[in-house]
Every structure is written in structure tokens, then in C-alpha cells.
């Protein structure tokens, strides 16, 4: 009997966590406190524009490799109902700030996000780059390299065709 209950509990936990951060799901809000301030994901996502969210860390070489491309995408599309947000996971805020300054990252950042954020979005590795629609629905995740801009361009074009 205990084995059956244990198995059912594991299945229930798996079922609940399956929906976390999956394509088509609404964003899961979180709050991060740092330097006397609170920042929420909802300060950026679900506010009427497409948001590309990069979960990263300064010590992560693949994260660093994606940043120049993200900066180009941000600069290219920032006037088109689009924005980029960085969320530094499991990183010392001082290290995050140093990298932001060194690389000249122009888009906003949420610093000092910990494991709870990775858990909320079922993030297994970084960088984890996600695209949310204007209502805050997750429309793409696991974006890397040229596929980031392809997803952004496709979303913005779909939005433009709906306006016509």
C-alpha cells in the first residue's frame, strides 16, 4: 500500500510540474529582491508586447556567446512592440553587473534570481531563452543562435498580419 501511495505521489508531482513553463502556458510570475528593490517578471512580461527572456549567468560560456546576438535583436526590434529581459540565475549580482557593463548589455535585467526561478520554469540548463507573446503566453523556448531572431521575426510578422 505504501508503495502505491508513493508511486501516486510521484506521478502527481510529475503531472503538476509538467505544465510549468511549457509552450502555450501563461507566464509564471516571480519576485526577486535585490539591493533594496523588488522586481517581478510581470513588470516586463504580459504587458502588451513580445518579450524575449534570457535566463543566464555570468560564469556560463554559452550564455556569454548568445549575448551579442541578443543585443543585435534588441536593437533591431525594440521599437516594434518587442523587448528583451535578462534574468541572472544562480549568479553573484556583482559578477552579473560586471558582465552587463563589459558587454554593454542595453536591455533590463533581473539580478539575484535563484534556484526557485529555475524550478518554476523547469530550466535544466542555461542559457534558456524564451519568447512570450503580448498577453504573457509562452510561445517558444529553448531558442539558440539564429533561431532566436527567426522566432522573434515570425511572431512580429504574425502580429502585423493580424492588424491588417
Language-model features: locations:
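Bacterial Sec-dependent N-terminal signal peptides
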Residues: 1-22
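Hydrophobic beta-strand core positions in alpha/beta domains
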Residues: 52-54, 86, 130
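Thiol-based oxidoreductase modules, predominantly thioredoxin-like and allied folds used
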Residues: 80-95, 105-114
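Non-globular targeting/processing and membrane-anchoring segments
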Residues: 160-164
